[in-house]
């Protein structure tokens, strides 16, 4: 049984529930299957089999529906952190000097990262009986982990729609730490921060925007959503990736390789620098200008059913340039040739 058939069978088996609660349950198990496949590296069939028999699943849904204990789990205060809660919004303040690594894991939750004061790291997020987010600070590692939605909490999903989840992170302009932030199905944005360690930002099925930022190395990824990057600098490699969407990159400076990848989406760029530059897409145009003269680059390029301004590039310069697409044009110019 595949996922579509399984979810339809579950929908039919829960016919006694109101339509909104029935769909909440179906959506919950759809996400649970995706999580199992991602976390355990298993197939769709294996993830479905691990859920148990259909009658057991239906019974667990009905048991969760009758549960009335809505107490928010008690959490112990974290040493070195000042925590405040108001109207379900939790604010955690930490001395920046105590942090060397920041890890954030959200779910279906937008993340915004911005520049604040010079001495503190501030986290704000929504936490209630339907959303459990665990905060910890140990040996210089700050962790904020949003737990998977429980079966019990799915019947509070009406509140989830009225009170939107979010995570905001405010850090010093010069953050003496590495930063790794991930979410899913939600927008991510970062502006005006210099990260002394590596920077990794990831989401899915939504856009991601990073501006005026620097780091030791950068890996910025989404899927099925636009990626916008401007004013980025890294002493190491920079990788920008999305799929089925447009990728825009301007004023990007990598001390090592610079990679731009998407599919079924246009790549628009200007002022890119790296020891090697790769730009790959499909079914869309690659369009922009590079610094220096044409003889600064050694070019590999390919397209189909489209024009290619790099087709007759014969120079053997110090910087490898690899540009590929399909069913569309490659239009690359060089500023020193203008």
Predicted regions and their residues:
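Short, surface-exposed interaction patches in beta-rich subdomains
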Residues: 147, 211-212, 218-221, 227-338
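Amphipathic alpha-helical segments within well-ordered protein domains
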Residues: 11-15, 34, 44-48
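Acidic/polar low-complexity surface segments
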Residues: 154-158, 298
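Residue-level detector of well-ordered alpha-helical segments, enriched
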Residues: 21-28, 57
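Short, charged early-sequence alpha-helical segments and their helix-coil boundaries
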Residues: 37-77
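Amphipathic, heptad-repeat alpha-helical segments
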Residues: 2-21
């Amino acid at each position: 049984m595949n996922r579509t058939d399984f979810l339809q069978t579950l929908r039919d088996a829960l016919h006694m529930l109101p339509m909104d609660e029935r769909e909440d349950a179906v959506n919950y198990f759809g996400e649970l299957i995706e999580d199992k496949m991602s976390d355990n590296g298993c197939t769709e069939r294996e993830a479905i089999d691990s859920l148990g028999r259909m009658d057991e699943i239906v019974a667990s849904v009905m048991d969760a529906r009758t549960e009335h204990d809505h107490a928010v789990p008690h959490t112990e205060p974290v040493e070195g952190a000042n925590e405040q809660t108001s109207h379900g919004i939790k604010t955690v303040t930490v001395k920046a000097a105590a942090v060397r690594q920041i890890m954030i894991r959200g779910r279906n939750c937008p993340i915004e990262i911005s520049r604040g004061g010079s001495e503190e790291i501030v986290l704000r997020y929504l936490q209630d009986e339907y959303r459990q987010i665990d905060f910890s600070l140990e040996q210089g590692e700050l962790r904020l982990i949003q737990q998977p939605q429980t079966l019990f909490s799915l019947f509070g999903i009406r509140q989830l729609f009225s009170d939107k989840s979010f995570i905001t992170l405010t850090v010093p302009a010069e953050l003496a730490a590495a930063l790794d932030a991930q979410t899913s199905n939600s927008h991510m944005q970062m502006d005006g921060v210099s990260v002394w360690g590596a920077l990794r930002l990831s989401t899915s099925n939504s856009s991601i925007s990073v501006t005026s930022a620097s780091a030791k190395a950068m890996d910025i990824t989404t899927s099925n959503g636009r990626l916008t990057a401007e004013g980025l600098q890294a002493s190491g490699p920079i990788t920008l990736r999305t799929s089925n969407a447009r990728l825009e990159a301007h004023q990007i400076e990598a001390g090592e390789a610079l990679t731009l990848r998407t599919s079924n989406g246009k790549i628009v760029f200007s002022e890119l620098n790296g020891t090697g530059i790769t730009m790959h897409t499909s079914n869309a145009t690659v369009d922009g200008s590079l610094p220096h003269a044409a003889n600064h680059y050694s070019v590999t390029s390919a397209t189909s059913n489209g024009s290619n301004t790099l087709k007759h590039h014969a120079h053997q310069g110090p910087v490898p340039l690899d540009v590929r697409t399909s069913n569309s044009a490659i239009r690359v110019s060089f500023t020193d040739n203008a």
